[in-house]
Amino acid sequence: DIVMTQAVFSNPVTLGTSASISCRSSKSLLHSNGITYLYWYLQKPGQSPQLLLYQMSNLASGVPDRFSSSGSGTDFTLRISRVEAEDVGVYYCAHNLELPYTFGGGTKLEIKR
């Protein structure tokens, strides 16, 4: 199985500044077709996870372009520019390169008070 690894907490960020969340996979998620099968989800408090980005860098419908993702085959970064209070929650990376699809343990976005 492919193991997705994330830090439990982000570095605390101030509202209005940028945040970065990292994810590492134990196997390259770059397919021979050129697609990287890496996904990012956000689970806000009391809600189900929502898809943010698919195939590494494509924004899901309705997701603001403050969110972006980049990376290599195994190391990925989710970037949030101009962090807002509504961005608080747990961010998960996941893959669907091959079965079983697996998720990282999640990274909680910490806001400086």
Curated annotation (Swiss-Prot):
Region (Complementarity-determining-3): 94-102
Pfam families assigned: V-set (PF07686)
Chain spans, region Complementarity-determining-1: 24-39
Cysteine disulfide partners in this protein: 23-93
Family matches, as SMART domains: IG (SM00409), IGv (SM00406)
Claim: tRNA processing is one of the keywords in the record: no
Stretches the record annotates as Framework-3: 62-93
Region annotated Framework-2, chain positions: 40-54
InterPro entries: Ig-like_dom, Ig-like_dom_sf, Ig-like_fold, Ig_sub, Ig_V-set, IgV_Light_Chain
GO terms under cellular component: immunoglobulin complex
Region (Framework-1): 1-23
Segments of this protein annotated with the region Complementarity-determining-2: 55-61
Keyword vocabulary terms for this entry: Adaptive immunity, Disulfide bond, Hybridoma, Immunity, Immunoglobulin
BP terms from Gene Ontology: adaptive immune response; immune response
Region of interest (Framework-4), ranges: 103-112
Function: Anti-streptococcal group A carbohydrate antibody.
Protein name (Swiss-Prot/TrEMBL): Ig kappa chain V-II region 17S29.1
